[in-house]
């Protein structure tokens, strides 16, 4: 089984892939979410792991559009606690460090810690990639922010642990595929959808009332501008349910009240 991840081995995406699918998988490394979406859309992997939101930094909005624009399907989700650590080439003193480098999302999640340093903050494409580069090139003036898996895999020394601003730092990942038939959920109880509404007063409230009347629990709503139409928005939602039949009835009714509805996937709620 081929599973694509954003980043390289030792990254948080790699950890999710191993925990979700097990160790007997072939990992395909992608250095950007765009590359990940392209690889999945082209059918070069069976599944892909994509971070979608974080409890500190919020939604990764471009990733919603990548799933939508590439007609990808969400077949599962996974949550992990993110514990960021500062790591250096073995033996290097923190006072000798000039730069601290990591993925922009990791830097944002460690904002309070970074404010207290006099180091130059450098954005990079992946947490684990920075760690690997430090080791491969014997870089001694740069520290990486990454997970413990990266430190262990690339032989770096961890000098500060759990440097994220909020200690309960959780990230939600979705498991995506090109084909809906690759779904691995037998009894789905969560769905991800997109809908577009007209500019009528109360149109959004009407949709929310339909969901509530069918016993659907809205767990996420994210508005995203429609580029071609200024000041018009599409809504991406996650909803949980206990009765699949009532869910389908609700979506049928929502479709009649919306300009368009698109279902990205039904799957098992990780939190249930």
Language model feature labels by segment:
Residues 1-272:
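Domain-level signature for soluble enzymes in the chorismate/prephenate branch of the shikimate pathway
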């Amino acid at each position: 089984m081929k599973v694509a991840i954003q980043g390289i081995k030792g990254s948080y995406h790699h950890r999710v892939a191993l925990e979700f699918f097990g160790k007997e998988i072939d990992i395909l490394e992608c250095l950007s979410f765009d590359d990940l979406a392209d690889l999945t859309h082209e059918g070069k992997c069976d599944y892909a792991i994509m971070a979608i939101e974080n409890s500190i930094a919020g939604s990764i909005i471009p990733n919603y559009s990548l799933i939508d624009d590439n007609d990808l399907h969400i077949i599962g989700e996974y949550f992990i606690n993110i514990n960021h650590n500062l790591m250096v080439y073995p033996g290097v003193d923190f006072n000798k460090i000039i730069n601290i480098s990591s993925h922009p999302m990791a830097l944002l999640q460690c904002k309070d810690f970074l404010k207290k340093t006099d180091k130059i903050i450098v954005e990079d494409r992946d947490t684990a990639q920075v760690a690997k580069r430090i080791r491969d090139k014997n870089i001694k003036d740069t520290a990486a922010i990454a997970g413990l898996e990266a430190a262990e895999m690339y032989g770096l020394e961890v000098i500060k642990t759990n440097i994220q601003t909020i200690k309960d730092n959780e990230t939600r990942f979705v498991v995506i595929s090109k084909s809906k038939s690759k779904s691995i959920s037998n009894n789905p109880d969560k769905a991800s959808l997109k809908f577009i509404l007209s500019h009528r007063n109360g149109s959004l409230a009407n949709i929310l009332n339909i969901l509530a009347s069918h016993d659907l629990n809205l767990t996420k709503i994210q508005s995203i501008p429609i580029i071609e139409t200024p000041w018009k928005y599409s809504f991406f939602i996650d909803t949980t349910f206990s009765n699949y039949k009532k869910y389908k009835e609700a979506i049928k009714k929502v479709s009649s009240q919306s300009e368009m509805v698109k279902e990205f996937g039904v799957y098992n709620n990780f939190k249930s």
